[in-house]
Amino acid sequence: MPCRIAIDGPAGSGKTTVAKILADKLGIYYLDTGAMYRIIGLYLDKKGVENDSDIERELSTIKLEFINGDFYINGKRVGDEIRTPYAGICASKYAKKAIVREFLTRIQQKISKNENIVVEGRDIGTVVIPDAEVKIFLVASAEERAKRRYKELLDKGVKVSYEEVLNEIILRDKQDTEREIAPLRQPDDAVLIDSTKYTIEEVINKILEVVLEKCKLKLQKE
């Protein structure tokens, strides 16, 4: 029986960092679904498509692959261009589209099927893997999330202001919680963790307690 760990939460709540470390400690796969929406959002934005028929046409030309932890779109490896605030806005814009969500959900379900895997995003425990063995809902204040994202971008050499990042966080929250299709919400059976008051290590340990209790997995790294 596989152990599929679903980690959901708003933008900048630490999902990506936590999911990566957790997967590494457990020696299992890690899938960042938010990155997939950023990839498709930027691609469709560059194509300038808005209506469903045009989006459907463009999606039919896309081959999105997940190979050894990296994403490739039509054979080209995806880099840090998807981590900018603008890419986040594009992601939320197109994530409202049912056709886009269905396209990516199918790919995500195919990747995670019958695998020991950590999958993080905004609708993993509610839509992508509603029967996941472990569900975590990770939250933090908007200000704390903006500080984290701002530092992350600066460390990568991306020029951006704190105010710009905070505004993006606030906008993303509004878009993600109010969209009609698969809005961001806490699954009924998810464990809620507010990372505002915890270190990354403390969050990881809390999740590991849940995982090791529910799944037949062993720590590969301390």
Curated annotation (Swiss-Prot):
Major localisation: cytoplasm
SUPFAM superfamilies assigned to the protein according to its UniProt record, in alphabetical order: P-loop containing nucleoside triphosphate hydrolases
Gene Ontology CC annotation, any one: cytoplasm
EC number: 2.7.4.25
Binding site for ATP: G9, P10, A11, G12, S13, G14, K15, T16, T17
Superkingdom to which the source organism belongs: Bacteria
UniProt key word ATP-binding: yes
Stated family: Belongs to the cytidylate kinase family. Type 1 subfamily.
Protein's recorded name: Cytidylate kinase
High-level lineage: Bacteria, Thermotogati, Thermotogota, Thermotogae, Thermotogales
